C-alpha cells in the first residue's frame, strides 16, 4: 500500500528568525540535519510560540528496530522546553530516519503516546516525520489526526 508523502520546501527557515509554519519547511530543516548517506537516527527541534526554531537535536546510532526511541525523544525534548507563557505553548517536530524502512506496525499508537507525552509538558507535538529512501510520511495520518500547522 502506498503511503502519502510530504515534500521538503526549497526555502530553509533561518534559526531564531523565520517561522516554520508548515510541514514542508519543517521537513527542509530535517533534511538539513540528516546524515548523508542516510543512517538510522532521530532528529528533533523545538519551536517557540511564534514557530521559530533554534537548536536541532540529532541522535545517531539508533538501533534500526528501536521504533519506540522516538517517544523517549519527545518526552525528553518536551521536558526541556520552557513553560508555556502568555505568548502560548512551544511546538515540537521530530523525525525518525529509517533508511530501509517506512511506517511500521504500531506507529499510529506511537504517535498517540508521543502526543500525550508532549502535552503533559505543555508542548504541542506538531509533526513526526518518518523519512526513508522513498520520501517522508507522517504517522499522524495513520492515527487519523488532522494537520497541526
For each predicted feature, which ranges?
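Polybasic/polar functional segments that serve as interface/processing modules
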Residues: 1-149
